[in-house]
Amino acid sequence: MATERYNPRDAEPRWQQKWNEDKVFETDNSDPREKYYVLEMFPYPSGRIHMGHVRNYAMGDVVARYKRARGYNVLHPMGWDAFGMPAENAAMERGVHPASWTYQNIGSMKAQLKAMGLSLDWSREFATCDVEYYQHQQHLFLDFLEKGLVYRKQSKVNWDPVDNTVLANEQVIDGRGWRSGALVEQRELTQWFFKITDFSQDLLDALDTLDQWPEKVRLMQKNWIGRSEGLTIRWEIVAETAPAGETEITVYTTRPDTLFGASFLAIAADHPLAKDAAAKNADIEAFCEECRRAGTSLAALETAEKKGMDTGIRVRHPLDPSWELPVYVANFVLMDYGTGAIFGCPSGDQRDLDFARKYGLPVVAVVMPQDGDAASFSVGDTAYDGDGVMINSRFLDGKTTEEAFNIVADRLSAASLGNTPQGERKVNFRLRDWGISRQRYWGCPIPVIHCDDCGVVPVPKKDLPVKLPDDVTFDQPGNPLDRHPTWRHVSCPTCGKDARRETDTMDTFVDSSWYFTRFTAPWEAKPTDPEAANRWLPVDQYIGGIEHAILHLLYSRFFTRAMRETGHVAATEPFKGLFTQGMVVHETYSRGAGGSREWVAPADIRIEEIDGKRRALLLTTGEEIAIGSIEKMSKSKKNVVDPDDIIASYGADTARFFVLSDSPPERDVIWSEAGVEGAHRFTQRLWRLISEAADALSAVAPAPATEGEALSISQAAHRTLKAVENDYDKLWFNKAVARIYELVNALAAPMTRVAAGEGDATYRAAVRNAAEILIQLVAPMTPHLAEECWMALGNEGLLARTGWPQYGETLVIENDVVLPVQINGKKRAELTISRDADQNAVTNAVLDLDAVKNALNGQAPKKIIVVPQRIVNIVV
């Protein structure tokens, strides 16, 4: 065969068309084979895919193609997480309807994804903004409402003043909106909530069953759920300082053992006692208002400067009524965590210590390390928050912190205040219910109606969907549904009188909390086909960024439980396996400095390297510009690489191969032109090897060799096959690439010999077998090239429909073993020797090792113990 360079511009569209025509990747739910569901987190249709998408979807595609070849019935769908603020922002900025903007972007991104050659079942595609999708989400909402998993209440919310919408606590990052970056305010609004807290303990306990999730993600969820065992303590208010009608303050604490270190109580700005104090004191009122303007997330409160104001209220210590403590309003106490009140032990908590030092409050050390000296131990600038031994704590002195906890809990449970136990053991959770109301248009309408006579009335299921109106305007911020002249005005389904639709829409995280279930039967007239959902769920391998560890993944776990409670699925967990891939990062380039800095795109510069020093020069002027740090690709810093440009220049397979090969998949991959060119050279080399030998091999039946000069060829291929199987199973793509490179090197000379007409029939059969294994190993990563090579060898049918090769057991056995050599129990050397060597041969070889000779220093060994194929121990 005349060898030409592999041309991806010709090959890739051709094979994509063949796969499409043959419907290779469309999944049949009735297929009886063992199922495998692989899913990458579906994208938001922002307009263009980026290299991070390419890496994410390439990883999922390798898994899908590999499992398909291994004989599984693979489900590998794709859709669009399509609701959200960016579409409304585009509507305001460009005067285009959110739907038009969204579907146009979907069209562009779908074309890009198809150009990557992903083995996706596009027949199951949907966007969450499709009425056909969100009508089922409304159905689920009504089922949850009926089951008591949805409720409505007046609540303090995080208000984003730029996006004009409510944010969940998890969406407030360092006091700012996660999308807009605006400083978040607190407002009182009536909101809809999902009762995720009903499942707090289950969500926590089940983390132990998710052994195919990264430990880091499980720990993040565990901390977010935040289970704590503590004590609710009722503190008596000193009568002369008590507001009218108030007699006590209830505090929840996880450290009742430190009660004798207490020097103050702190309450939230919205605590009833704080409101009473604010009504009487303008300074306190102003301070409470300042607290309300701060973010409500725990992360924001932990980083903010600790501030407080004395209310004038005093309480009696529960273990010593003669001891009075001041009550402060503090900016680090949340009304919706615990009871909205805490006691401060400065010696045992850094936050409390900082607060006490600031306001001149006592600091008494009450816990010291086990090996501490009670006479000299004290707390300086750093609190001691560990376990240890009690000091300065009267009847608790000398007890461990655990013993002290139980003694205090028992004593206060037996004591009474107003005929009620003064203390009560309690389990608390940091997790809050999920507020889903958003004051925006481009989201799933909440299917309820407000009637002056009947109250809140669910929309009857027969009247679903509640469709978004198309005729809306975005000429001002806020929710267009509130301003719509007709849409919100309806008749009450119960009494028939005039009523109003709910104009809030659902948080977009609702849309992504069950989409993986809908993929199992997207044509179903109900939210799910339980039979299909129960067959496919949980997702066997889910792939996405660790930034979703809490929000999306926790919400999805809740939703699956809620859907189980309402009869839609049998599964408890949505995702059996989770993989969080690293980002694609790139150098940054800029000119100027400070406020005048201008970022420059990689496509606009060339890199020059002289004597090991790199310079970046503008293509247009030759001006040298600064090479900055390596960062996540972002439009703002222009360090992005357009996948379309890479595909046009090198082909999709090169892009896929590079992002899979350059670093471990859980780590960031640094994008470099040199790396891409290296991946491209590999694809050309592989094509050259196969195509040059194709004529000589096309009529040869593949068969591994069992002896002779071809044996080493078959051993190399089959050992690589076994190793790469393990790599693919464990998502070690970069290791698989390294082994494939080694196999290509091992096959280069044999392929060249065969191409030159050399080698007997056994040799050619072994080379053909090895070549086919090589092609099948690269197929999940470079599928177009693999199909082209497969066809070049004269194979009929699509490689995408071909089963995975099997390695020969005798061919993968290593002939040599490496034995550790110990002298008196300490490892001194290693011996590489034939697996079949007898004990005498092993003994003689060990004694001939230089390391052993040096260690023995002329001594004769007393005994040499050989454990066959395991270890050698020399006793002297």
From Swiss-Prot:
Location of this chain's protein in the cell: Cytoplasm
Catalytic activity entry: tRNA(Leu) + L-leucine + ATP = L-leucyl-tRNA(Leu) + AMP + diphosphate
SUPFAM superfamilies reported for this sequence: Anticodon-binding domain of a subclass of class I aminoacyl-tRNA synthetases, Nucleotidylyl transferase, ValRS/IleRS/LeuRS editing domain
Placement of sequence motif 'KMSKS' region: 632-636
Motif ('HIGH' region): 43-53
Pfam families given in the database record: Anticodon_1 (PF08264), tRNA-synt_1 (PF00133), tRNA-synt_1_2 (PF13603), tRNA-synt_1g (PF09334)
GO molecular function, one term: leucine-tRNA ligase activity
Protein name: Leucine--tRNA ligase
Species annotation: Rhizobium leguminosarum bv. trifolii (strain WSM2304)
The organism's taxonomic lineage, starting at the top: Bacteria, Pseudomonadati, Pseudomonadota, Alphaproteobacteria, Hyphomicrobiales
